[in-house]
């Protein structure tokens, strides 16, 4: 009988302690619930914007992008074309000219999205890029691809697309700058031939 009473008391005390240990005592806040507004702000929604007039490939305002000594093309980005799309898009739009080794201009209107994390949570979008138009320099117009899609920027990007890997490092690493002036500064610091953070690349 005495043992039964002790057992009942032990169970009663244990239950009381368990009840007193609330979720707020855990290292993870299990009570937090994301609001619809927060979820909407986190989810990506592409902003529809008209393409700008096709620029002159030989005008001022183009910035030379350095990839590496073995990259045979001459990529340039039009600084005046840089813009950050409003939320919930947040991607960076720009115009590239990937000039061939024979001097042919290849203009593209593109966007790059910088994810906050390398891991997608829920509907969170991963880092990716998209081509919105190809430049027709003969007829001075953009040709929009029929099935343009955002292409994920994965671990193989550096090997398969060295140019956009440089743009990703310039725009995305360390967070997206607050304005276009910050984007221009990033390009000069990280993507130029004589970027301050890099040694001169001339042989």
From Swiss-Prot:
GO biological process: proteolysis
A Pfam match: CNP1
Signal peptide: 1-18
InterPro entries assigned: CNP1-like_dom (IPR014861)
Molecular-function GO term, any one: peptidase activity
Record's subcellular location: Periplasm; Cytoplasm
Coiled coil: none
Keyword terms, alphabetized: Cytoplasm, Periplasm, Signal
Domain of life: Bacteria
Regions crossing the membrane: none
Family according to the record: Belongs to the Cnp family.
Other comments on record: Was suggested to be clpB, but this protein is not that chaperone.
Name of the protein in its database record: Cryptic neisserial protein 1
Lineage of producing organism: Bacteria, Pseudomonadati, Pseudomonadota, Betaproteobacteria, Neisseriales
């Amino acid at each position: 009988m005495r043992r039964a009473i002790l057992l009942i008391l032990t169970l009663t005390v244990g239950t009381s302690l368990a009840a007193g240990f609330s979720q707020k005592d855990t290292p993870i806040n299990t009570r937090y619930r994301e609001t619809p507004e927060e979820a909407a702000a986190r989810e990506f929604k592409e902003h529809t914007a008209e393409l700008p007039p096709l620029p002159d490939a030989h005008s001022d305002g183009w910035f030379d992008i350095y990839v590496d000594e073995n990259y045979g093309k001459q990529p340039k980005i039009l600084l005046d074309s840089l813009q950050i799309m409003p939320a919930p898009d947040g991607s960076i739009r720009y115009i590239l000219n990937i000039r061939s080794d024979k001097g042919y201009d290849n203009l593209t209107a593109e966007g790059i999205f910088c994810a906050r994390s390398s891991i997608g949570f829920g509907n969170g979008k991963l880092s990716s890029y998209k081509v919105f138009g190809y430049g027709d320099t003969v007829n001075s117009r953009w040709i929009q691809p029929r099935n343009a899609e955002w292409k994920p920027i994965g671990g193989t990007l550096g090997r398969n697309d060295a140019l956009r890997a440089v743009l990703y490092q310039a725009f995305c690493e360390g967070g997206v700058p607050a304005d276009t002036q910050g984007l221009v500064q990033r390009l000069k610091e990280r993507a130029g031939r004589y970027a301050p953070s890099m040694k001169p690349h001339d042989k």
